[in-house]
Amino acid sequence: LLRKGVGSFFFLAEIICNLELEPDQQQTDHCGECTACIDACPTQAIVQPQVIDSNRCISYLTIEDKTWPESNEITKTESWAYGCDICQDVCPWNKFSQPNQEPRFAPREMISWDNSQWEQTLVEPARIKSQLKKSAMQRAGLKKLIAQIDLALKYRPE
């Protein structure tokens, strides 16, 4: 889903109401012949233009899949502990995106942690728990995040 001048970095929302509303006009497909996201996806989760097999998607596996990381798809995520935005990163429309100015969406301290700091979370889970306060990352659950951090560290270069 793309917005001209913004790209694909935005939140979706819905409003539930009982009003009769006219539907918006269908948006133009701005992708054209571009396959950058399809080509870049490490798990081939984008199976054709505008079709995602969520069961292959690293974001789904690391956030939503309750059997992860016990399932047999472990090598697909390699050094990813939570989520993935590769498809977003390679989208040419995102060169127009601007960093969000909302303080609640600012990167947390842990974004710049090195391997030793991540390893510390394995012996001291409270370290990451404090970083997750009021974060969407809580959705995955602390136990799952710790398991994924452990897994990601095994694949992450020093």
PLM feature spans:
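Catalytic cores of enzyme domains
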Residues: L1-M110
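Alpha-helical scaffold domains
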Residues: W68-E158
